[in-house]
Amino acid sequence: MLVNTFNLFVIPQVYFMRILFFFFGLIHAAAFAQPPSKPISLKSKNQWVDSSLDKDGWKYFQDQYTDESALSEGNEEMPFVPSLLESGKDLFSSLTGFSFSIRRFRMKGLNNRYFSQSINEISMNQLSDGNIPWANWGGLNEVTSNNQYAAGLKENEYQFGALGNSVFMQLNASKLFPQTTFTLNLSNRNYHQRFAFTKVWSENKKGWTIATSVAFKQGIGGQLTANEFIGFSYFFSIDKRVDNHLFSLALLGNRQMNTRTAAITKELVDLTGSKQYQPSWGLQTGKVRNANWQFNHHPMLLLSHEYNMHEKIKQVSSLLVSMGEKYTTALDWFNAADPRPDYYRYLPSFFTDSLLAQDLISQIQLNPSQLQINWDHLYWINQNSTTDKRARYLLEDRVEQSKKVVLNTRYRIQLNNRLLVSFQGQYRLEIYHYFKRINDLLGAAYSINWNQFAEDNLPGSTAIQNDLNNPNQKIYVNDQFGYNYRMHLQQWLFLSQVQYTLPKFDFNAAVEYNATNYQREGIYRNGVFPQNSYGLAEPDYFRNGQIKMGLTYKLNGRNYYYFRTAYSTKPPLVNDLYISPRISSHKQTDISNETAYMAEAGYILHAPSLKLTANAYWISIHHAMDVMSFYHDGYRNLVNYTLSNIGSRMMGLEFSMAYSLSAGLTLNTAINAGKYIYLQRPNYSVMADNEQYISEKGILYIDHFPITGLPQLAVYTGLAYRSNGNLFLNLSSSFMANQWLSFNPIRRTYGAAQNLPSNLDNKLISNPSAIPKAFIVDFSAGYSCRIKKFRDGHAYYLQFFFGVNNLLNQSIVTGGYEQLRFDTPGGDLNKFPNKYYYSAGTLYSLSIKWKL
């Protein structure tokens, strides 16, 4: 039934043939007709562009794809063809990494756990959710740009890698580029000003190297009325070289507080006349106040030791110690009306009487503040509802505190000029503490640690107690309440890799084994689950592994063909294993390791006037799990939808090209054409928060349903001009299509279709919700000038960069989701309509850097 919805995946054959013939002509001309180029020594570090701009597409030319001198040698019929070198991003990622991000593009359609990031050889991926906590080092762009990149299954010597891509960051002071820089950024993005200072000293005669960097970001207002952002980032690293040993210490972190944006319905856009409307703020005594904040601060201490045991043997050991906290704020209420101004019962669409609906529209037009939080009213309710001023409303923090210890050791052995082997072991311990905390009582005197939903469904019972060990607890500002538990996660990992280089072939392989265990520790004894919520639960153990192999054929120093394949198994994420860890230790019944198969094949051309990459990929993932929690109108309760046996398949083509039209002028193109679908029919079960049994079981009818939340077709085209290394101009466009909203599983069940009124077509309920196509135009320019040159050779430089995104000033849909609440009896999609995120229109960034 749903197969017909995928016609948009198919690009017309005539269009494809024209593209193929065009590119074939370019390849033939560049790869086989051009004379060899003169040897050119490329700089391995960017010495003039501003690395703090988070924009890689316009500086692809600085990435070191191959060594040009080796290329010219490769054209001289040498018996040994050099291997392809990549110290920076591959061409496709460099062009698309920034431009496609507006639509949440993910390479190959993979989720976050199939991408990896490491710092000083320690993986940053979290065991809890598989995510990479980029915010932990945000703002330190001047030092964190020192990294290497491996796309897909490409070989690397640091980690196994990932199916998506891998980034390996080195923050040892002695491996950073010596510099003294002052940077000022002005922007109309989330933050408006950024000030940064970075100083990296060269290694002195006694073997010491020191590096430091600090940055401050802040912004108030701008595109969004209640936007606020403040962040302070810091970095310090010191190295000491003693004979064959290098000892390193690095301390870094980012303390950041900022408001968040919410998705909105089209009805709210029509009512307010703005796609930038946000329901999470209002006026308090005439001043703007936002209820939706997030905070993050996780300092990291990294210790490392490199020991060159032999000219062919190297040992690298690293230790990570990190602890910190992040939280989001939100309004909570008890026995009171919903304070959110966008609550569906407060909107005209809720009323079936057209006169009432029109009257409400008129009220909103006369008083737009009706669609904002009425803070003064919340304070009045808290102070006047009861004599003891017990809180009806409060502002809560949803807190996650973490402690991490990771130890990694790797041996690198160069057996001969052709054979490199490495062995690696890693131990990881992560402890997470989850709880709610009172941020502000909003004028009330206290609150009570009770479960409102249990009181509604089980009146008069002990189920109302969030903590039976401390019943009827009065709570105040900064007290914990609601839920309170810890997760103890451990993993042992062993890895072996081999890289073998032959005159015409390169071969690589890697094998990894890992053992993971999870254990929940309840700090509260929940009133609904008194026997299954407090103390340590039974641990879960998982054994998994990965294997990958790759073969590259080196036709000559310009043309490379490769094939790579991998098989991987991963434990379920702990957040998908437990049904509702907030209140109990209950787990899914159908628990299994997630398996993934991947194969990719491609071609790389690196000629003097043309650089080209083409990569075809096929990925199949099975036995994935998920948990969704939301309020269910049918059960009149918070419910947890558990999904198991989720399968998916991603296949497609990544193509990128940089063609030199003339001296200094380059045409850039990148295309991702994919087809990402769910396979099979996952199992689902429903368990309410306040019930100890499964309420419903079944299967989801999503076989061949599109994977949602990202564009499956994306095209980048750009013209870049560079003059004498001092001036850079880039004009580019991005087209993105074939994207759908994150879906509601209820609408794809048998029960949803059976309960619909006879006059409704069930396809209207089950078909995916598409997002409109998007076309974006960007512009960037950079200029560098030397202010003063000294006799010893060093000089002062002043560098400028100006970037404008979304030149056409469109407020496009960047993403969204189907609401998890659904009108099951009536099938009315307008009762809980889709919610969308919108871009903020034209954004600019001006950067000025002074390099000493």
What are these regions (language model features)?
Residues 93-95, 122-153, 170-176, 277:
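Short acidic/polar hinge/loop motifs at secondary-structure boundaries
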Residues 156, 165-203, 212-226, 732:
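Short strand-turn segments of transmembrane beta-barrel domains in outer membranes
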Residues 246-304, 327-396, 459-477, 627-630:
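Acidic/polar loop-and-plug regions of large Gram-negative outer-membrane beta-barrel proteins
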Residues 263-264, 268, 464-465, 469-472, ...:
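Surface-exposed extracellular loop regions of Gram-negative outer-membrane beta-barrel proteins
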Residues 276-300, 304, 487, 537-546, ...:
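Outer-membrane beta-barrel signature, preferentially recognizing the C-terminal barrel domain
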Residues 394, 420-556, 581, 683:
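Signature of Gram-negative outer-membrane beta-barrel scaffolds
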Residues 618-620, 641-746, 849-851:
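Gram-negative outer-membrane beta-barrel transporters
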Residues 667, 735-753, 783-852:
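C-terminal beta-signal and adjacent terminal beta-strands/loops
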